[in-house]
Amino acid sequence: MRVLIAAGGTAGHINPALAIAGALKKADPTAEIHFAGRKEGMEYRLVTQAGYPFHHIEITGFQRKLSLHNIKRNIVTLWNLALSGPKAKAIMKEVQPDLVIGCGGYVSGPVVRCAAKMGIHTALHEQNAFPGVTNKLLAPDVDIVFAAVPAAVEKLGAPQKTIVVGNPVRPEVFTQAKNRDAIRAQLGAGDRTVILSFGGSLGARRVNEVVGDLCAWEQHEHKSVLHLHATGQYGVQLFKDLEQQKGFAEGDSLVVKEYINNMPELLAAADLVISRAGALTLAELEAVGR
């Protein structure tokens, strides 16, 4: 069996796609799993790190706010959209998949639509209660739709072929939960309280601001903590500015990264998790009992 998965934009689309890929490989070790996405997107790094073949297709969303910059970006988007159909068809010819799965993000659009037109079996997975635009447009044309929660079924517009299955969680989230003590030892946590905070792969300004206040308090009050924080892509400079403004710094008690690549390990080690209520985040927190 050969499967092509299209997902992109944020970790909330990419990580469930990787979880699906892992489940397919477990069910059929001979299965070939391929991914389609943007090389400039987060999906390229996460998918190639996981060891799956990656096929590039350039597609972006439209900017809704009116400005000269956004007009230029929308012209580029129109150009990429025009090229995305032929590119998706070329990927189909190269991979020759038996099944194409869309897990959200703009990149799913041309890939899944092309597969459906070519008579290839197609499926969607929707992680959220409020489906994204791409999945809502694709749902009527695919063979089957998987929804994480019942609230999404009617909103997807294809209730007769939608099944509620929950959100897939990466196997390593469960396996690493058993290694809590060893992971804490590797982190040098000792008896300290381990706090893990993040606001999503792109970052959340308000989360970064609140965590900045917390980090300042922890250091000024000399609290016995090990705080691990991910700023997200758009929060890197903001958090550096907060360090200067509020008088705290990275060091033995605070580790700051743009993105956490070893989230299953850190979830296992954490005593407290501070995060946005993203669908996949909630699923993984529930899996480890945090």
Which role fits each region the language model picked out?
Residues 87-100, 107-123, 136, 140-141:
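Glycosyltransferases and closely related glycan-assembly transferases
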Residues 102-103, 263-290:
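A donor-sugar binding/catalytic signature common to diverse glycosyltransferases
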Residues 34, 42, 53, 116-178:
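Active-site-proximal region of nucleotide-activated glycan assembly enzymes
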Residues 28, 90-96, 187-190, 269:
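Glycine-rich phosphate-binding loop signature in dinucleotide/nucleotide-binding domains
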Residues 13-25:
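Short amphipathic alpha-helix
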Residues 46, 65, 178-181, 185, ...:
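Donor-nucleotide binding loops and adjacent catalytic segments primarily
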Residues 43, 81, 88, 134-135, ...:
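Acidic, amphipathic alpha-helical patches
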Residues 3-10, 30-83, 165, 233-234:
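Conserved nucleotide-sugar phosphate-binding/catalytic loop shared by glycosyltransferases and other
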